[in-house]
Amino acid sequence: HQCAVVGDKFMRKVESGDKSARRLWGKLLQKRKATGEPYILFKGNTNKSNPAAYKKHGLKVHMTNICSEITLHTDESHSFVCCLSSLNLAKYDEWKGTNLIYDAIWFLDGVLEEFIQKSKGKVGFHNSVRSAEKGRALGLGVLGWHTYLQEKGLPFEGLLSQYETRKIFSQIKIESERASMALAETFGEPLWCVGTGLRNTHLRAIAPTVSNSKLSGNVSPGIEPWAANVFTEQSAKGTFIRKNPTLKKILRKHKLDNEIIWNRILKDGGSIQGIKALDKITLGPHDIPLKEVFKTFKEINQLELVNQAGIRQQYIDQSVSLNLAFPSIATPKWINKVHFEAWKKGIKTLYYTRTESVLRGDIAEQAMDDSCLSCDG
């Protein structure tokens, strides 16, 4: 895998019309559309929003990880450690107002301590242990975001989902920091956190969670929209048909959960937009049309996706595995606009650009990416 590290100075040159910069930027976007890579690390956005502990010690972020959600300091003496877990937003109503977030941070800090104790003195682990001891960075994230919205009858796009984004991720920020302060009082502040009142330099990062989302009730992965409402998936055990469980429940309620409907959705690449029988169905207290709520990844305005990600990034001290999806006919102008807006919104990293695998409603390729198993699960 490859990652392009892009600075603010370069982006301002692109913005001002510098021919050389625009030519290089165009090649980068063309490569992302053709192959899905390279990932992008917006270095300026990342380092401007570094936590107080990093700024105090002059620590900079120079790279990200294989899934683009980790933004931690590295140098000749320090290698970052991924210590991650994810909250299931499909079950948000069950755990909101509880100590789940608080307890999850204590759990992750304990996991990191076990890594430190077991890895001390082992060949090849010196830099990782040193980094973990000094910063104790964690990455609590989420999965099931699109499932949560669909269960509420809310579209991925618009003010309603933006409100939910602020509500949930601000809560995660507040509760995770409360836990880190309690940990610091109990066990002390590590070197890089001295004077901050926190036990951890970082607390939040959102991983892809493709595998973990399946194990958690077949919910949507990470903060990503469903690629399709029904799709074929290949694994070592064979080929399976997976259906959006929330849509299936609604179709059953309206006596439309039948093979004719599902075969039509599959034929249409996982989309329900062409099915007239679904035109008049509305959901939730806002009477949102079913077809708005169950738009697939490729049908969602990618600028809306970026706007939502920009809001979320304000509450995430590391980064987010953020994919973008474009049809093969997407113009260079549109792809540039979406990527440029990501930089302007303060987004730190961009993961894959999805094209044909999303359009087919077939996520077999997506599920089989050789991404990091720790991030994936």
Feature locations, PLM:
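Glycine- and acidic
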Residues: 12, 85-96, 120-133, 150-166, ...
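Internal maturation/activation junctions in enzymes
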Residues: 103-129, 133, 152-209, 262, ...
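Short coil/turn segments at secondary-structure boundaries
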Residues: 2-6, 39-46, 119-129, 192-196, ...
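Hydrophobic/aromatic-rich, well-ordered segments within soluble, folded domains that form packed cores
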Residues: 137-155, 334-347
